[in-house]
């Protein structure tokens, strides 16, 4: 009898210890045939979780994608209401014809074609290329940067969604860049809109000149892979957002090239930086639209229309010239135009 009581007590203690253990983590495994699982199977490892093999399924990135879609639809509705609202005294057709008759639209279309060709061939430098040429054509820094950022809202939004769908976005890197980048963009847009264009123009041109030299310097760099988490990402995002808004471009050359230059994975770095760029471009475009006013809309239309026809030219450049030659050419053109803009600012 006593032995039975001892056995019963031991069994009760064992059951109690089992019930007090923390529950095992429920893992959402990806059991499909894919490259990662094939590698794990060869090494005798278990399948990866679904969030690893399909990063676009992460709730944070799904929310980001829906936010991009919602904001793009809202912008289209706003622009349509502004264009066809009879309260402005003119019909939408009249406004379109007036824009097409002006030289501003066609100059901006040529700039948009060139800048989007460069961006399509190199994957960056749309902002600094278009801003450099707009400044040379006589636009003020605020109007040039405002036009570029408003035009970029749609391209960066579509690009960001594409990168998420292709699994090119690192959630942690995206979140670390997002808020600092937006704060920097707001501060930069307010700064360039608040200072007289004649005063700030030579400084913006000097910044673009340095960016041209920076692009040229990439021709001579060799990148070594680095799997460690990048440091000072928030500071980099804040600085990149600020100079991007002030100079009309630079988020990609500053942030992407800095992170990739330290050895970070190019695929997820480019995707994460592109997705974050939409949100900082959006907030800076709002600030510019409030502070600059109606001035940039013909330039915005020209940049967008010109950029629509750039794809075949970008493909041709990519096929005929290697990336190093393109970098050297683009960096040289931006630097030369910036020197010209500095000369004009002081004469």
Model features per residue range: what roles?
Residues 2-115, 120, 132-137, 141, ...:
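Juxtamembrane transmembrane-helix boundary motif
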Residues 128, 132, 136, 143-156, ...:
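Early transmembrane hairpin of solute transport permeases
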Residues 150-158, 183-184, 191, 275-283:
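Membrane-embedded alpha-helical segments of transport systems
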Residues 271, 284-287:
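Feature detects amphipathic, helix-rich regulatory segments
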């Amino acid at each position: 009898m006593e032995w039975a009581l001892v056995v019963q007590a031991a069994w009760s203690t064992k059951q109690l210890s089992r019930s007090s253990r923390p529950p095992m983590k429920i893992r959402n495994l990806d059991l499909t045939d894919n490259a990662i699982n094939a590698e794990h199977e060869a090494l005798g490892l278990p399948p990866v979780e679904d969030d690893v093999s399909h990063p676009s399924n992460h709730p944070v990135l799904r929310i980001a994608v829906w936010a991009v879609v919602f904001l793009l639809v809202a912008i289209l509705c706003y622009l349509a209401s502004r264009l066809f609202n009879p309260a402005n005294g003119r019909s939408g057709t009249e406004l379109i014809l007036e824009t097409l008759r002006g030289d501003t639209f066609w100059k901006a279309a040529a700039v948009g074609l060139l800048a989007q060709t460069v961006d399509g061939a190199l994957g960056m430098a749309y902002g600094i290329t278009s801003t450099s040429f707009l400044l040379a054509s006589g636009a003020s820094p605020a109007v040039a940067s405002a036009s570029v950022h408003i035009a970029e809202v749609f391209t960066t939004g579509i690009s960001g969604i594409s990168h998420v769908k292709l699994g090119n976005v690192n959630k942690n890197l995206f979140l670390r860049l997002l808020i600092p980048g937006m704060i920097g963009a707001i501060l930069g847009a307010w700064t360039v809109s608040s200072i007289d264009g004649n005063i700030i123009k030579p400084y913006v041109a000097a910044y673009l000149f340095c960016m041209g030299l920076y692009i040229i310097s990439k021709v001579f760099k060799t990148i070594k892979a680095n799997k460690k988490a990048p440091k000072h990402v928030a500071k980099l995002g804040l600085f990149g957002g600020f100079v991007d808004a002030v100079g009309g471009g630079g988020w990609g050359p500053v942030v992407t090239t800095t992170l990739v230059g330290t050895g970070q994975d190019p695929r997820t770095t480019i995707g994460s930086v592109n997705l974050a760029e939409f949100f900082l471009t959006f907030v800076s475009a709002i600030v510019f639209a409030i502070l600059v006013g109606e001035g940039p809309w013909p330039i915005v239309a020209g940049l967008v229309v010109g950029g629509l026809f750039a794809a075949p030219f970008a493909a041709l450049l990519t096929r005929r010239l290697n990336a190093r030659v393109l970098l050297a050419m683009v960096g040289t053109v931006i630097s030369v135009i910036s020197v010209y803009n500095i000369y004009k600012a002081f004469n």
